[in-house]
Amino acid sequence: MGKTPSPGKWIKSLLGKKSSKSSLEKGGEKLRSAKKEELVVKVKDNNVSKLPTEPPVVSSQEVAATQTVVVPDVVIAEKQLSGDIEGDESSNVNLESGNDSEEVKLEEAATKVQAALRAQQAREESQNLKGITRVQAVIRGHLVRRQAVATYSCIWGIVKVQALVRGKKARSSETVAQLQKTNTETETSETLQGSTYSWMENPTKLSMIDKLLVSSPTTLPLKIQYSPEDPNSAKVWLGRWTQLQVWAPGPLVVKNLVPKSQTKKRSFQAVEAEKGKLKRGVRKPTGVSTTANSSTSRSTADNEKPKRTVRKASTLGKELSKIENDKSKQSSRKSTSAIKEGSSVEVKDEKPRISHKKASLSNGIGKATRKSAEKKKEIADAVQKELPIEEVSVSLVDAPEDEKMNLIPVTISKESDLDKDEKSLVLDKPEQDELRTAERDDKAEEELKTAERDDSAEEKIQEPDAQISSENGNVASENTKPSDRRASLPAKIENHHQDDGLTQSGRKIPSYMAPTASAKARIRGQGSPRIAQEKPEKNGTTRRHSLPPAANGKLSTMSPRAHRLLIASAKGSMNSDRSFSSSKDIGDKSTKAEWKR
Protein backbone atom coordinates (compact mmCIF):
# COMPACT_ATOMS: atom_id res chain seq x y z
CA MET A 1 0.00 0.00 0.00
CA GLY A 2 2.88 2.36 0.54
CA LYS A 3 3.32 5.18 2.97
CA THR A 4 0.06 6.90 3.85
CA PRO A 5 -0.11 10.67 4.62
CA SER A 6 -1.45 12.10 7.85
CA PRO A 7 -5.26 12.02 8.13
CA GLY A 8 -5.56 15.83 8.11
CA LYS A 9 -3.66 16.25 4.89
CA TRP A 10 -5.49 13.32 3.35
CA ILE A 11 -8.92 14.88 4.10
CA LYS A 12 -7.80 18.36 2.91
CA SER A 13 -6.58 16.86 -0.31
CA LEU A 14 -9.98 15.21 -0.74
CA LEU A 15 -11.89 18.41 0.05
CA GLY A 16 -9.59 20.65 -2.01
CA LYS A 17 -8.74 23.17 0.80
CA LYS A 18 -5.18 24.42 1.16
CA SER A 19 -3.59 25.37 4.46
CA SER A 20 -2.31 28.96 4.47
CA LYS A 21 0.23 30.11 6.94
CA SER A 22 0.08 33.90 6.80
CA SER A 23 1.61 36.66 8.90
CA LEU A 24 -1.13 36.16 11.44
CA GLU A 25 0.70 33.18 12.82
CA LYS A 26 3.86 35.20 13.12
CA GLY A 27 1.99 37.94 14.90
CA GLY A 28 0.44 35.41 17.25
CA GLU A 29 3.81 34.08 18.14
CA LYS A 30 5.03 37.57 18.95
CA LEU A 31 1.94 38.14 21.05
CA ARG A 32 2.59 35.02 23.08
CA SER A 33 6.14 36.08 23.75
CA ALA A 34 5.00 39.56 24.74
CA LYS A 35 2.64 38.20 27.34
CA LYS A 36 5.41 36.32 29.00
CA GLU A 37 8.12 38.95 28.86
CA GLU A 38 8.25 42.70 29.38
CA LEU A 39 8.32 45.04 26.42
CA VAL A 40 11.73 46.33 25.48
CA VAL A 41 11.90 49.78 23.81
CA LYS A 42 14.86 50.76 21.65
CA VAL A 43 16.02 54.30 22.16
CA LYS A 44 18.80 56.23 20.41
CA ASP A 45 21.87 57.37 22.28
CA ASN A 46 21.01 61.03 21.97
CA ASN A 47 17.67 60.66 23.59
CA VAL A 48 19.03 58.47 26.40
CA SER A 49 21.06 61.29 27.89
CA LYS A 50 18.00 63.54 28.03
CA LEU A 51 15.90 61.01 29.93
CA PRO A 52 15.18 61.75 33.58
CA THR A 53 16.96 59.87 36.27
CA GLU A 54 13.80 58.54 37.77
CA PRO A 55 12.99 55.07 36.53
CA PRO A 56 9.91 54.72 34.41
CA VAL A 57 7.00 52.80 35.78
CA VAL A 58 5.56 50.24 33.38
CA SER A 59 2.02 49.21 34.11
CA SER A 60 0.79 45.71 33.33
CA GLN A 61 -2.63 44.85 31.93
CA GLU A 62 -3.88 44.01 35.40
CA VAL A 63 -3.51 47.60 36.69
CA ALA A 64 -6.79 49.30 37.40
CA ALA A 65 -8.15 52.06 35.13
CA THR A 66 -8.45 54.65 37.91
CA GLN A 67 -4.73 54.75 38.56
CA THR A 68 -2.76 57.61 36.99
CA VAL A 69 0.81 57.14 35.92
CA VAL A 70 3.21 59.85 34.70
CA VAL A 71 5.12 58.61 31.63
CA PRO A 72 7.36 60.49 29.22
CA ASP A 73 6.20 61.22 25.66
CA VAL A 74 8.45 58.72 23.98
CA VAL A 75 7.14 55.90 26.12
CA ILE A 76 3.54 56.83 25.41
CA ALA A 77 4.12 56.79 21.66
CA GLU A 78 5.60 53.33 21.84
CA LYS A 79 2.66 52.11 23.92
CA GLN A 80 0.25 53.28 21.31
CA LEU A 81 2.07 51.38 18.67
CA SER A 82 2.08 48.26 20.83
CA GLY A 83 -1.65 48.58 21.51
CA ASP A 84 -2.42 48.56 17.83
CA ILE A 85 -0.31 45.48 17.35
CA GLU A 86 -2.02 43.67 20.24
CA GLY A 87 -5.43 44.30 18.79
CA ASP A 88 -4.43 42.74 15.50
CA GLU A 89 -2.96 39.71 17.25
CA SER A 90 -6.06 39.05 19.35
CA SER A 91 -8.15 38.87 16.23
CA ASN A 92 -5.71 36.38 14.72
CA VAL A 93 -5.81 34.17 17.86
CA ASN A 94 -9.57 33.87 17.69
CA LEU A 95 -9.36 32.71 14.06
CA GLU A 96 -6.68 30.12 14.83
CA SER A 97 -8.64 28.60 17.76
CA GLY A 98 -11.61 28.04 15.48
CA ASN A 99 -9.41 26.41 12.85
CA ASP A 100 -7.84 24.04 15.47
CA SER A 101 -11.21 22.66 16.64
CA GLU A 102 -12.25 21.96 13.06
CA GLU A 103 -8.98 20.14 12.40
CA VAL A 104 -9.47 17.90 15.46
CA LYS A 105 -12.91 16.87 14.32
CA LEU A 106 -11.67 16.20 10.83
CA GLU A 107 -8.84 14.02 12.16
CA GLU A 108 -11.22 11.90 14.24
CA ALA A 109 -13.51 11.34 11.28
CA ALA A 110 -10.54 10.45 9.09
CA THR A 111 -9.24 7.82 11.58
CA LYS A 112 -12.66 6.15 11.72
CA VAL A 113 -12.92 5.99 7.95
CA GLN A 114 -9.38 4.62 7.68
CA ALA A 115 -10.08 1.89 10.27
CA ALA A 116 -13.18 0.76 8.43
CA LEU A 117 -11.39 0.68 5.12
CA ARG A 118 -8.42 -1.26 6.50
CA ALA A 119 -10.67 -3.85 8.16
CA GLN A 120 -12.46 -4.44 4.90
CA GLN A 121 -9.18 -4.84 3.06
CA ALA A 122 -7.91 -7.35 5.66
CA ARG A 123 -11.05 -9.47 5.33
CA GLU A 124 -10.73 -9.59 1.59
CA GLU A 125 -7.07 -10.56 1.78
CA SER A 126 -7.73 -13.41 4.26
CA GLN A 127 -10.47 -14.83 2.07
CA ASN A 128 -8.21 -14.65 -0.95
CA LEU A 129 -5.45 -16.53 0.94
CA LYS A 130 -7.84 -19.30 1.98
CA GLY A 131 -8.97 -19.77 -1.56
CA ILE A 132 -5.40 -19.85 -2.80
CA THR A 133 -4.38 -22.55 -0.28
CA ARG A 134 -7.33 -24.71 -1.26
CA VAL A 135 -6.49 -24.41 -4.91
CA GLN A 136 -2.85 -25.28 -4.22
CA ALA A 137 -3.83 -28.41 -2.24
CA VAL A 138 -6.08 -29.60 -5.03
CA ILE A 139 -3.41 -29.05 -7.65
CA ARG A 140 -0.73 -30.81 -5.61
CA GLY A 141 -2.99 -33.81 -4.96
CA HIS A 142 -3.63 -34.18 -8.68
CA LEU A 143 0.08 -33.97 -9.41
CA VAL A 144 0.99 -36.59 -6.80
CA ARG A 145 -1.63 -38.99 -8.08
CA ARG A 146 -0.50 -38.54 -11.65
CA GLN A 147 3.13 -39.15 -10.63
CA ALA A 148 2.19 -42.32 -8.72
CA VAL A 149 0.27 -43.66 -11.68
CA ALA A 150 3.18 -42.91 -13.96
CA THR A 151 5.71 -44.69 -11.75
CA TYR A 152 3.39 -47.67 -11.30
CA SER A 153 2.91 -47.99 -15.04
CA CYS A 154 6.65 -47.75 -15.63
CA ILE A 155 7.44 -50.46 -13.06
CA TRP A 156 4.70 -52.66 -14.47
CA GLY A 157 6.18 -52.36 -17.93
CA ILE A 158 9.68 -53.17 -16.66
CA VAL A 159 8.40 -56.28 -14.88
CA LYS A 160 6.62 -57.45 -18.01
CA VAL A 161 9.71 -56.98 -20.11
CA GLN A 162 11.83 -58.91 -17.59
CA ALA A 163 9.30 -61.75 -17.54
CA LEU A 164 9.33 -61.98 -21.31
CA VAL A 165 13.11 -62.01 -21.45
CA ARG A 166 13.37 -64.69 -18.78
CA GLY A 167 10.78 -66.83 -20.51
CA LYS A 168 12.67 -66.65 -23.79
CA LYS A 169 15.92 -67.59 -22.06
CA ALA A 170 14.28 -70.53 -20.34
CA ARG A 171 12.79 -71.81 -23.59
CA SER A 172 16.08 -71.45 -25.45
CA SER A 173 17.93 -73.30 -22.67
CA GLU A 174 15.42 -76.18 -22.81
CA THR A 175 15.92 -76.60 -26.56
CA VAL A 176 19.70 -76.51 -26.22
CA ALA A 177 19.53 -79.07 -23.43
CA GLN A 178 17.39 -81.42 -25.52
CA LEU A 179 19.81 -81.15 -28.46
CA GLN A 180 22.81 -81.90 -26.26
CA LYS A 181 21.02 -84.89 -24.79
CA THR A 182 20.59 -86.59 -28.13
CA ASN A 183 24.12 -85.84 -29.36
CA THR A 184 26.55 -86.18 -26.43
CA GLU A 185 25.12 -88.46 -23.72
CA THR A 186 24.99 -92.24 -23.68
CA GLU A 187 21.80 -94.26 -23.40
CA THR A 188 22.06 -94.65 -19.62
CA SER A 189 22.60 -91.00 -19.04
CA GLU A 190 19.78 -90.20 -21.48
CA THR A 191 17.31 -92.38 -19.62
CA LEU A 192 18.38 -90.98 -16.27
CA GLN A 193 18.14 -87.36 -17.33
CA GLY A 194 14.93 -87.98 -19.29
CA SER A 195 13.27 -89.15 -16.10
CA THR A 196 14.57 -86.20 -14.07
CA TYR A 197 13.75 -83.44 -16.59
CA SER A 198 10.58 -84.87 -18.11
CA TRP A 199 8.42 -82.33 -16.32
CA MET A 200 10.21 -79.50 -18.15
CA GLU A 201 9.16 -80.62 -21.67
CA ASN A 202 5.74 -78.93 -21.50
CA PRO A 203 5.94 -76.23 -18.81
CA THR A 204 2.72 -74.61 -20.07
CA LYS A 205 0.63 -77.46 -18.66
CA LEU A 206 1.19 -76.27 -15.11
CA SER A 207 0.91 -72.58 -14.35
CA MET A 208 2.96 -72.85 -11.15
CA ILE A 209 5.91 -74.35 -13.04
CA ASP A 210 5.73 -71.57 -15.60
CA LYS A 211 5.77 -68.94 -12.85
CA LEU A 212 8.74 -70.58 -11.19
CA LEU A 213 10.65 -70.69 -14.46
CA VAL A 214 9.89 -67.03 -15.09
CA SER A 215 10.81 -65.87 -11.60
CA SER A 216 14.00 -67.90 -10.99
CA PRO A 217 17.07 -67.01 -13.07
CA THR A 218 19.05 -70.23 -12.23
CA THR A 219 16.74 -72.88 -13.70
CA LEU A 220 19.35 -74.17 -16.15
CA PRO A 221 20.61 -77.76 -15.78
CA LEU A 222 24.19 -78.63 -14.86
CA LYS A 223 25.28 -79.49 -18.44
CA ILE A 224 24.78 -75.98 -19.78
CA GLN A 225 26.90 -74.41 -17.07
CA TYR A 226 29.86 -76.73 -17.70
CA SER A 227 31.42 -78.17 -20.82
CA PRO A 228 31.68 -81.96 -21.38
CA GLU A 229 35.45 -81.84 -20.69
CA ASP A 230 34.87 -80.20 -17.32
CA PRO A 231 34.97 -82.68 -14.39
CA ASN A 232 31.83 -81.05 -12.97
CA SER A 233 29.72 -81.99 -15.99
CA ALA A 234 26.88 -84.48 -15.67
CA LYS A 235 28.50 -87.37 -17.54
CA VAL A 236 31.83 -87.36 -15.68
CA TRP A 237 30.07 -86.89 -12.35
CA LEU A 238 27.80 -89.86 -13.04
CA GLY A 239 30.79 -92.07 -13.88
CA ARG A 240 32.60 -91.14 -10.69
CA TRP A 241 29.45 -91.74 -8.63
CA THR A 242 29.01 -95.24 -10.13
CA GLN A 243 32.66 -96.10 -9.44
CA LEU A 244 32.30 -95.23 -5.75
CA GLN A 245 29.19 -97.46 -5.36
CA VAL A 246 27.75 -95.52 -2.48
CA TRP A 247 24.58 -97.63 -2.45
CA ALA A 248 26.52 -100.81 -1.51
CA PRO A 249 26.27 -101.63 2.25
CA GLY A 250 29.38 -101.79 4.40
CA PRO A 251 29.18 -105.07 6.39
CA LEU A 252 32.46 -104.59 8.20
CA VAL A 253 31.43 -101.25 9.63
CA VAL A 254 28.10 -102.63 10.84
CA LYS A 255 29.75 -105.63 12.51
CA ASN A 256 32.18 -103.39 14.36
CA LEU A 257 29.52 -100.98 15.61
CA VAL A 258 27.15 -103.52 17.14
CA PRO A 259 29.49 -105.26 19.62
CA LYS A 260 30.93 -101.92 20.73
CA SER A 261 27.54 -100.65 21.77
CA GLN A 262 26.76 -103.92 23.57
CA THR A 263 30.02 -103.92 25.49
CA LYS A 264 29.47 -100.33 26.55
CA LYS A 265 26.00 -101.06 27.83
CA ARG A 266 27.12 -104.18 29.66
CA SER A 267 30.04 -102.44 31.35
CA PHE A 268 27.79 -99.52 32.34
CA GLN A 269 25.23 -101.92 33.82
CA ALA A 270 27.93 -103.82 35.72
CA VAL A 271 29.30 -100.58 37.19
CA GLU A 272 25.80 -99.54 38.24
CA ALA A 273 25.20 -102.94 39.85
CA GLU A 274 28.46 -102.68 41.81
CA LYS A 275 27.58 -99.17 42.97
CA GLY A 276 24.14 -100.34 44.05
CA LYS A 277 25.66 -103.18 46.05
CA LEU A 278 28.08 -100.86 47.79
CA LYS A 279 25.35 -98.40 48.66
CA ARG A 280 23.10 -101.12 49.99
CA GLY A 281 25.88 -102.58 52.13
CA VAL A 282 26.71 -99.20 53.62
CA ARG A 283 23.16 -98.04 54.24
CA LYS A 284 22.12 -101.12 56.24
CA PRO A 285 21.44 -100.22 59.89
CA THR A 286 23.82 -101.79 62.38
CA GLY A 287 22.07 -104.62 64.17
CA VAL A 288 23.13 -106.94 66.98
CA SER A 289 25.61 -109.54 65.69
CA THR A 290 26.57 -112.79 67.43
CA THR A 291 30.18 -112.87 66.16
CA ALA A 292 33.09 -110.46 66.60
CA ASN A 293 33.93 -110.39 62.87
CA SER A 294 30.58 -108.94 61.86
CA SER A 295 30.78 -106.29 64.60
CA THR A 296 34.22 -105.09 63.46
CA SER A 297 33.18 -104.89 59.79
CA ARG A 298 30.11 -102.83 60.64
CA SER A 299 32.11 -100.45 62.83
CA THR A 300 34.58 -99.76 59.99
CA ALA A 301 31.73 -99.15 57.52
CA ASP A 302 30.05 -96.76 59.93
CA ASN A 303 33.28 -94.83 60.47
CA GLU A 304 33.82 -94.40 56.73
CA LYS A 305 30.31 -93.17 55.85
CA PRO A 306 28.40 -92.10 58.96
CA LYS A 307 25.92 -89.84 57.15
CA ARG A 308 24.32 -92.63 55.14
CA THR A 309 23.87 -94.85 58.18
CA VAL A 310 22.23 -92.03 60.07
CA ARG A 311 19.77 -91.44 57.25
CA LYS A 312 18.88 -95.12 57.06
CA ALA A 313 18.41 -95.35 60.79
CA SER A 314 16.21 -92.27 60.80
CA THR A 315 14.02 -93.81 58.13
CA LEU A 316 13.74 -96.99 60.22
CA GLY A 317 12.72 -94.91 63.22
CA LYS A 318 10.02 -93.20 61.15
CA GLU A 319 8.67 -96.55 59.91
CA LEU A 320 8.51 -97.88 63.46
CA SER A 321 6.81 -94.69 64.61
CA LYS A 322 3.99 -95.19 62.11
CA ILE A 323 3.41 -98.75 63.39
CA GLU A 324 3.39 -97.83 67.07
CA ASN A 325 1.44 -94.59 66.74
CA ASP A 326 -1.95 -96.00 67.72
CA LYS A 327 -0.70 -97.85 70.80
CA SER A 328 1.43 -94.98 72.07
CA LYS A 329 -1.44 -92.46 71.95
CA GLN A 330 -3.44 -94.52 74.46
CA SER A 331 -0.50 -95.12 76.80
CA SER A 332 0.74 -91.50 76.76
CA ARG A 333 -2.49 -90.05 78.15
CA LYS A 334 -2.51 -92.35 81.20
CA SER A 335 1.20 -92.10 81.98
CA THR A 336 1.60 -88.29 81.97
CA SER A 337 1.35 -87.99 85.75
CA ALA A 338 4.11 -90.55 86.40
CA ILE A 339 6.26 -88.98 83.70
CA LYS A 340 6.15 -85.50 85.24
CA GLU A 341 7.26 -86.85 88.63
CA GLY A 342 10.30 -88.54 87.07
CA SER A 343 11.25 -85.42 85.09
CA SER A 344 11.91 -83.40 88.27
CA VAL A 345 14.42 -86.02 89.42
CA GLU A 346 16.15 -85.95 86.04
CA VAL A 347 16.65 -82.17 85.98
CA LYS A 348 18.54 -82.20 89.27
CA ASP A 349 20.93 -84.96 88.19
CA GLU A 350 21.81 -83.69 84.70
CA LYS A 351 24.92 -81.66 85.56
CA PRO A 352 27.06 -83.97 87.79
CA ARG A 353 26.86 -86.99 85.49
CA ILE A 354 30.40 -87.00 84.13
CA SER A 355 32.14 -86.51 87.49
CA HIS A 356 30.17 -89.30 89.19
CA LYS A 357 30.90 -91.71 86.37
CA LYS A 358 34.62 -91.61 87.10
CA ALA A 359 34.06 -92.24 90.81
CA SER A 360 31.78 -95.21 90.26
CA LEU A 361 34.14 -96.77 87.74
CA SER A 362 37.11 -96.51 90.08
CA ASN A 363 35.11 -98.12 92.89
CA GLY A 364 34.00 -100.96 90.58
CA ILE A 365 37.62 -101.69 89.64
CA GLY A 366 38.54 -102.38 93.24
CA LYS A 367 35.69 -104.83 93.69
CA ALA A 368 35.74 -106.77 90.38
CA THR A 369 38.51 -108.48 88.43
CA ARG A 370 40.87 -106.75 86.03
CA LYS A 371 39.06 -107.94 82.94
CA SER A 372 35.74 -106.59 84.11
CA ALA A 373 37.45 -103.33 85.16
CA GLU A 374 38.95 -102.87 81.69
CA LYS A 375 35.59 -103.43 80.07
CA LYS A 376 33.98 -100.97 82.48
CA LYS A 377 36.53 -98.30 81.57
CA GLU A 378 36.00 -98.76 77.84
CA ILE A 379 32.22 -98.66 78.15
CA ALA A 380 32.38 -95.58 80.39
CA ASP A 381 34.48 -93.77 77.76
CA ALA A 382 31.88 -94.64 75.15
CA VAL A 383 29.12 -93.25 77.34
CA GLN A 384 31.07 -90.03 77.97
CA LYS A 385 31.42 -89.56 74.24
CA GLU A 386 27.73 -90.19 73.87
CA LEU A 387 26.64 -87.41 76.26
CA PRO A 388 27.00 -84.49 73.77
CA ILE A 389 24.85 -86.46 71.33
CA GLU A 390 22.16 -86.76 73.99
CA GLU A 391 22.30 -83.03 74.71
CA VAL A 392 22.00 -82.25 71.03
CA SER A 393 19.01 -84.55 70.84
CA VAL A 394 17.35 -82.66 73.70
CA SER A 395 17.76 -79.33 71.90
CA LEU A 396 16.44 -80.81 68.69
CA VAL A 397 13.43 -82.40 70.30
CA ASP A 398 12.44 -79.17 72.03
CA ALA A 399 11.76 -77.62 68.62
CA PRO A 400 8.15 -76.82 67.60
CA GLU A 401 7.76 -79.94 65.42
CA ASP A 402 8.14 -82.38 68.29
CA GLU A 403 6.51 -85.30 66.56
CA LYS A 404 8.87 -85.25 63.54
CA MET A 405 12.16 -84.29 65.13
CA ASN A 406 12.13 -86.66 68.11
CA LEU A 407 12.90 -89.67 65.87
CA ILE A 408 16.33 -88.56 64.64
CA PRO A 409 18.44 -88.14 67.85
CA VAL A 410 17.32 -91.50 69.26
CA THR A 411 18.51 -93.37 66.19
CA ILE A 412 21.83 -91.50 66.23
CA SER A 413 22.45 -92.38 69.86
CA LYS A 414 21.47 -95.99 69.18
CA GLU A 415 24.00 -96.38 66.38
CA SER A 416 26.72 -94.54 68.25
CA ASP A 417 26.25 -96.93 71.19
CA LEU A 418 26.64 -99.95 68.96
CA ASP A 419 29.65 -98.56 67.12
CA LYS A 420 31.46 -97.51 70.28
CA ASP A 421 30.79 -100.80 72.04
CA GLU A 422 32.09 -102.69 69.01
CA LYS A 423 35.21 -100.55 69.00
CA SER A 424 35.77 -101.23 72.67
CA LEU A 425 35.88 -104.99 72.02
CA VAL A 426 38.64 -104.71 69.43
CA LEU A 427 41.34 -103.18 71.59
CA ASP A 428 45.00 -104.09 71.27
CA LYS A 429 47.23 -105.24 74.09
CA PRO A 430 49.22 -101.99 74.45
CA GLU A 431 45.97 -100.08 74.93
CA GLN A 432 44.93 -102.52 77.68
CA ASP A 433 48.25 -101.99 79.46
CA GLU A 434 47.73 -98.22 79.42
CA LEU A 435 44.26 -98.67 80.85
CA ARG A 436 45.60 -100.84 83.66
CA THR A 437 48.13 -98.19 84.69
CA ALA A 438 45.43 -95.52 84.65
CA GLU A 439 43.22 -97.73 86.79
CA ARG A 440 45.91 -98.19 89.42
CA ASP A 441 46.32 -94.42 89.71
CA ASP A 442 42.59 -94.02 90.08
CA LYS A 443 42.52 -96.64 92.85
CA ALA A 444 44.91 -94.65 95.05
CA GLU A 445 42.82 -91.53 94.70
CA GLU A 446 39.43 -93.13 95.24
CA GLU A 447 40.27 -95.21 98.35
CA LEU A 448 40.04 -92.05 100.45
CA LYS A 449 36.36 -91.62 99.62
CA THR A 450 33.67 -93.24 101.73
CA ALA A 451 31.42 -96.12 100.68
CA GLU A 452 28.33 -93.95 101.05
CA ARG A 453 29.44 -91.53 98.38
CA ASP A 454 30.34 -94.45 96.12
CA ASP A 455 26.88 -95.95 96.51
CA SER A 456 25.19 -92.61 95.85
CA ALA A 457 27.41 -92.01 92.81
CA GLU A 458 26.51 -95.44 91.42
CA GLU A 459 22.83 -94.71 91.80
CA LYS A 460 23.21 -91.41 89.98
CA ILE A 461 25.16 -93.01 87.15
CA GLN A 462 22.36 -95.48 86.56
CA GLU A 463 20.11 -92.61 85.51
CA PRO A 464 21.73 -91.94 82.08
CA ASP A 465 21.24 -95.62 81.24
CA ALA A 466 17.63 -95.37 82.25
CA GLN A 467 17.19 -92.21 80.20
CA ILE A 468 18.77 -93.75 77.10
CA SER A 469 16.58 -96.81 77.46
CA SER A 470 13.51 -94.64 77.91
CA GLU A 471 14.44 -92.66 74.79
CA ASN A 472 14.84 -95.83 72.74
CA GLY A 473 11.64 -97.24 74.16
CA ASN A 474 9.54 -94.19 73.46
CA VAL A 475 10.61 -93.45 69.88
CA ALA A 476 7.12 -93.65 68.45
CA SER A 477 5.22 -91.63 71.07
CA GLU A 478 4.44 -88.38 69.24
CA ASN A 479 2.00 -86.74 71.65
CA THR A 480 4.33 -86.56 74.70
CA LYS A 481 7.30 -84.19 75.14
CA PRO A 482 10.90 -85.51 74.96
CA SER A 483 11.72 -84.37 78.49
CA ASP A 484 8.73 -86.33 79.82
CA ARG A 485 9.69 -89.36 77.76
CA ARG A 486 13.18 -89.55 79.16
CA ALA A 487 11.94 -89.28 82.69
CA SER A 488 9.35 -92.05 82.37
CA LEU A 489 11.48 -95.01 83.46
CA PRO A 490 14.13 -93.86 85.96
CA ALA A 491 11.83 -94.20 88.98
CA LYS A 492 11.07 -97.83 88.19
CA ILE A 493 14.72 -98.60 87.51
CA GLU A 494 15.86 -97.12 90.82
CA ASN A 495 13.28 -99.13 92.76
CA HIS A 496 14.36 -102.29 91.01
CA HIS A 497 18.03 -101.60 91.79
CA GLN A 498 17.19 -101.12 95.44
CA ASP A 499 15.48 -104.54 95.54
CA ASP A 500 18.34 -106.13 93.62
CA GLY A 501 21.13 -104.14 95.29
CA LEU A 502 22.97 -107.08 96.81
CA THR A 503 23.79 -108.58 93.47
CA GLN A 504 25.03 -105.27 92.00
CA SER A 505 26.91 -103.67 94.91
CA GLY A 506 29.92 -105.73 95.82
CA ARG A 507 29.40 -109.44 95.10
CA LYS A 508 32.09 -111.14 93.00
CA ILE A 509 31.29 -112.98 89.77
CA PRO A 510 31.03 -116.78 90.20
CA SER A 511 32.90 -119.05 87.83
CA TYR A 512 29.78 -120.17 86.00
CA MET A 513 28.73 -116.53 85.41
CA ALA A 514 32.14 -115.29 84.16
CA PRO A 515 32.15 -114.15 80.48
CA THR A 516 33.79 -116.64 78.13
CA ALA A 517 35.68 -116.01 74.89
CA SER A 518 32.62 -116.82 72.78
CA ALA A 519 30.45 -114.30 74.65
CA LYS A 520 32.71 -111.28 74.09
CA ALA A 521 30.77 -110.23 71.03
CA ARG A 522 27.60 -110.00 73.14
CA ILE A 523 29.05 -108.00 75.97
CA ARG A 524 27.00 -104.95 74.99
CA GLY A 525 23.90 -106.42 76.56
CA GLN A 526 25.43 -106.79 80.04
CA GLY A 527 25.23 -103.08 80.95
CA SER A 528 21.69 -102.76 82.24
CA PRO A 529 19.12 -105.57 82.56
CA ARG A 530 16.45 -103.90 80.48
CA ILE A 531 14.09 -106.85 80.24
CA ALA A 532 14.24 -107.43 84.00
CA GLN A 533 13.27 -103.82 84.47
CA GLU A 534 10.54 -103.98 81.83
CA LYS A 535 7.20 -104.16 83.62
CA PRO A 536 3.67 -103.82 82.25
CA GLU A 537 2.22 -100.36 82.61
CA LYS A 538 -1.28 -99.44 83.68
CA ASN A 539 -2.85 -99.98 80.28
CA GLY A 540 -1.22 -103.40 79.83
CA THR A 541 1.33 -102.41 77.15
CA THR A 542 5.04 -103.07 77.53
CA ARG A 543 7.76 -100.57 76.68
CA ARG A 544 10.09 -101.57 73.84
CA HIS A 545 13.73 -100.79 74.66
CA SER A 546 16.58 -100.39 72.19
CA LEU A 547 20.04 -101.89 72.60
CA PRO A 548 21.70 -100.86 75.90
CA PRO A 549 24.76 -98.61 75.84
CA ALA A 550 26.21 -100.30 78.95
CA ALA A 551 27.12 -97.07 80.72
CA ASN A 552 26.52 -98.12 84.35
CA GLY A 553 29.48 -100.47 84.52
CA LYS A 554 27.55 -103.47 85.97
CA LEU A 555 28.81 -106.54 84.08
CA SER A 556 28.08 -109.22 86.66
CA THR A 557 24.30 -108.89 87.09
CA MET A 558 22.95 -111.21 84.36
CA SER A 559 23.39 -114.87 83.60
CA PRO A 560 24.30 -116.11 80.09
CA ARG A 561 20.74 -117.32 79.63
CA ALA A 562 19.21 -113.93 80.45
CA HIS A 563 21.86 -112.35 78.25
CA ARG A 564 20.81 -114.46 75.25
CA LEU A 565 17.16 -113.64 75.88
CA LEU A 566 18.03 -109.94 75.93
CA ILE A 567 19.75 -110.10 72.52
CA ALA A 568 16.88 -112.07 71.00
CA SER A 569 14.33 -109.58 72.28
CA ALA A 570 16.38 -106.64 70.94
CA LYS A 571 16.51 -108.21 67.48
CA GLY A 572 12.81 -108.88 67.46
CA SER A 573 11.91 -105.32 68.44
CA MET A 574 13.67 -103.91 65.35
CA ASN A 575 12.00 -106.26 62.85
CA SER A 576 8.19 -106.20 63.12
CA ASP A 577 5.18 -105.85 65.39
CA ARG A 578 5.23 -109.57 66.24
CA SER A 579 8.33 -108.94 68.32
CA PHE A 580 6.29 -106.89 70.82
CA SER A 581 4.51 -109.94 72.24
CA SER A 582 7.65 -112.09 72.16
CA SER A 583 9.70 -109.45 73.99
CA LYS A 584 6.93 -109.20 76.59
CA ASP A 585 7.00 -112.96 77.23
CA ILE A 586 10.78 -113.02 77.39
CA GLY A 587 10.74 -110.09 79.80
CA ASP A 588 8.38 -111.96 82.12
CA LYS A 589 10.62 -115.05 82.06
CA SER A 590 13.75 -113.04 82.79
CA THR A 591 12.13 -111.29 85.73
CA LYS A 592 11.08 -114.62 87.19
CA ALA A 593 14.61 -115.99 86.78
CA GLU A 594 16.15 -113.05 88.60
CA TRP A 595 13.67 -113.19 91.47
CA LYS A 596 14.52 -116.88 91.89
CA ARG A 597 18.16 -115.96 92.28
UniProtKB/Swiss-Prot annotation:
Keywords noted in UniProt: Calmodulin-binding, Cell membrane, Cytoplasm, Cytoskeleton, Membrane, Nucleus, Repeat
Record motif Nuclear localization signal 2, residues: 356-363
Motif Nuclear localization signal 1, residue numbers: 264-271
Stretches the record annotates as Disordered: 1-31, 268-379, 407-597
Function of the protein: May be involved in cooperative interactions with calmodulins or calmodulin-like proteins. Recruits calmodulin proteins to microtubules, thus being a potential scaffold in cellular signaling and trafficking. May associate with nucleic acids and regulate gene expression at the transcriptional or post-transcriptional level.
Family from the record: Belongs to the IQD family.
Protein name per its UniProtKB record: Protein IQ-DOMAIN 29
Gene it is expressed from: IQD29
